[in-house]
Amino acid sequence: MSNPENAQDAMLGNEPAVEPVVEPTAEQHTDTLPSIEEQFRALELKAAEHYDAWLRAKAEGENIRRRAQDDISKAHKFAVEKFAGELLAVKDSLEAALAVQEQTVDSFKSGVELTLKQLVSAFDKNALNEVNPAGEKFDPHKHQAIGMVDSEQEANTVVTVLQKGYMIADRVLRPALVMVAKGK
């Protein structure tokens, strides 16, 4: 009402002029905020990126699994390669001994002893250990009792080894065949 025109209008009985309130239009809102469609497109792009990353990670996991299985398969296939190479020298020595036309018992025996040393060396290099438990306490994990005999030794002591056993590292390859003392 401080405006003189408004004062005149009020005196004349005219209604005062109200200044219209300008509301922002939808176009003005879209200028400042991204539209729903734009937000939706942005979220779709993010979802597609995440899906693509998931597919890549899944494929990489499958590739790693396949390569690991291939490596395991090759390890099984060629695990004995080193040991087999060591045994070839033993085979060669045996063939050479058989090829000699005139042998004496002494030369034959020394050849067999050398071949046995080669075999023992191959066993040692490949962690193949002999189990010869004579005089030891019977161990059912490493020994196989064939029978029990009367003995002056303590009960459950290995008296006789009928066949040596063998272990690879800590695993029994073949248990020793033994006779065990009954006790006093």
UniProtKB/Swiss-Prot annotation:
PROSITE patterns, alphabetized: GRPE
Alphabetic keyword roster: Chaperone, Cytoplasm, Stress response
Gene Ontology cellular component terms for the protein in this record: cytosol
CDD domains in alphabetical order: GrpE
GO MF annotation terms: adenyl-nucleotide exchange factor activity; protein homodimerization activity; protein-folding chaperone binding; unfolded protein binding
GO biological process, one term: protein folding
Main location: cytoplasm
SUPFAM superfamilies, alphabetized: Coiled-coil domain of nucleotide exchange factor GrpE, Head domain of nucleotide exchange factor GrpE
Highest taxon in the source lineage: Bacteria
One Pfam family it belongs to: GrpE
Entry's localization field: Cytoplasm
Keyword Metal-binding: no
UniProt key word Amino-acid biosynthesis: no
Matching NCBIfam families: PRK14139.1, PRK14140.1, PRK14150.1
Family the UniProt entry places it in: Belongs to the GrpE family.
The protein's role, per its UniProt record: Participates actively in the response to hyperosmotic and heat shock by preventing the aggregation of stress-denatured proteins, in association with DnaK and GrpE. It is the nucleotide exchange factor for DnaK and may function as a thermosensor. Unfolded proteins bind initially to DnaJ; upon interaction with the DnaJ-bound protein, DnaK hydrolyzes its bound ATP, resulting in the formation of a stable complex. GrpE releases ADP from DnaK; ATP binding to DnaK triggers the release of the substrate protein, thus completing the reaction cycle.
Complexes and interactors: Homodimer.
The protein's name: Protein GrpE
Natural source organism: Dechloromonas aromatica (strain RCB)
Gene encoding the protein: grpE
